Amino acid sequence: MIRNVVVINDFAYINGGAGKVAIMSALALADQGINVFFFCGTGPVCEELKNSKVKIVSTNQGDITKGSKIKGLLQGINNKFAEEKLYQLLQQLDKKKTIVHCHAWSKILSSSIFKATKKANIPVVITGHDYGTVCPNGCFYDFRKNEICSCKPLGCKCIIKNCDKKRYIYKAFRIIRQF
């Protein structure tokens, strides 16, 4: 029986659909007597979480799109600090009674969180709130041609196609993050 759920989201407040679902699911699970940890990149922690039984674990890091571009690039590709902090948390929990529920990890955290879950041998559930895990644009759309993209996600044509609404370098960054 599951006793511990680690909910992962970049932010500890509602800033869109992913945040709303992550926070509301954490609260609902805690109300059912589940031991819930909310692992996030930054606050401020919303009042709903503050006034609940949910335990907050934050890396207290900034958004990768703010501040130094080099720091953001490195943090976005491999957020080693978040990986280590999550692994430390997971080591404290019974892996037979714990799951990790991921919502959003692209603005502060990174896919390095999955290295921590794999190393800790804890199962992961992902609620996809967009297509960012398979499409570098996050929406299967060619912004240059203003049409739906027909490329195989992350296939050769997809990778070389300049379809981003910004510059190709942004798409390349998002592709690198996937691997």
Task: Name each region found by the language model.
Residues 2, 13-15, 28-80, 89:
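N-terminal strand-loop element at the rim of the active site
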Residues 8, 39-41, 127-128:
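Generic beta-sheet signal
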Residues 9-23:
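A short, glycine/small-residue-rich beta-strand->loop->alpha-helix junction that serves as a flexible
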Residues 19-20, 48-52, 69, 112-114, ...:
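Short aromatic-enriched loop/helix-cap "lid" or pocket-rim segments at secondary-structure transitions
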Residues 25, 29-30, 117:
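Hydrophobic alpha-helical packing residues
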Residues 32, 120-122:
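Helix C-cap/helix->beta junction micro-motif
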Residues 65-69, 126-179:
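Acceptor-binding helix/loop patch of EC 2.4 sugar-transfer enzymes
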Residues 89-109, 123-127:
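Short N-terminal targeting/anchoring amphipathic segment
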